[in-house]
């Protein structure tokens, strides 16, 4: 930011400036240590909105492939041991799971907005599933 020349202004007769506390004055007059610039921070929510727009534009899978594959194999072990999967079958399962979760989170967000909140909660997911008829 460029520095600008300050010019004298005529007082408008408002309140007299209050005296600062000694600690505040000392803090303001203390020199900046070595000119270290603090890192830039965005306002709360800005990065979240940017991520929402980015993920809504994209079509790639959001869950990593190998962890998802391990989870599928672990769940399948409970039903039958030594099951084998084609890679296309794992891919189809992952597409279906992600589509289901995205839809569930959309409905959950609508439930939170209906309750005049912006944060989704466990009860919103439960209500969304109940309205869908997935669980009683």
Curated annotation (Swiss-Prot):
Instruction: Kindly list the positions at which N6-methyllysine occurs in this protein.
Output: 5, 10, 19, 24, 28, 37, 80
Keyword Phosphoprotein present in the record's keywords: the answer is yes
**Pfam families listed in its UniProt record:** Histone
The reply to whether Nucleus figures as a keyword in the UniProt entry is yes
Annotated GO CC locations: nucleosome; nucleus
Question: N6,N6,N6-trimethyllysine modification sites?
Answer: 5, 28, 37, 80
Origin superkingdom: Eukaryota
Supply the alphabetized keyword list.
Answer: Acetylation, Chromosome, DNA-binding, Methylation, Nucleosome core, Nucleus, Phosphoprotein
- Quote the PTM field: Phosphorylated to form H3S10ph. H3S10ph promotes subsequent H3K14ac formation and is required for transcriptional activation through TBP recruitment to the promoters. Mono-, di- and trimethylated by the COMPASS complex to form H3K4me1/2/3. H3K4me activates gene expression by regulating transcription elongation and plays a role in telomere length maintenance. H3K4me enrichment correlates with transcription levels, and occurs in a 5' to 3' gradient with H3K4me3 enrichment at the 5'-end of genes, shifting to H3K4me2 and then H3K4me1. Methylated by SET2 to form H3K36me. H3K36me represses gene expression. Methylated by DOT1 to form H3K79me. H3K79me is required for association of SIR proteins with telomeric regions and for telomeric silencing.
- Stored SMART domains: H3
Name the protein family: Belongs to the histone H3 family.
The task this protein performs is described as: Core component of nucleosome. Nucleosomes wrap and compact DNA into chromatin, limiting DNA accessibility to the cellular machineries which require DNA as a template. Histones thereby play a central role in transcription regulation, DNA repair, DNA replication and chromosomal stability. DNA accessibility is regulated via a complex set of post-translational modifications of histones, also called histone code, and nucleosome remodeling.
Record-linked PANTHER family = HISTONE H3
Q: What is this protein called?
A: Histone H3.3
Q: What is the species listed in this Swiss-Prot or TrEMBL entry?
A: Lodderomyces elongisporus (strain ATCC 11503 / CBS 2605 / JCM 1781 / NBRC 1676 / NRRL YB-4239) (Yeast)
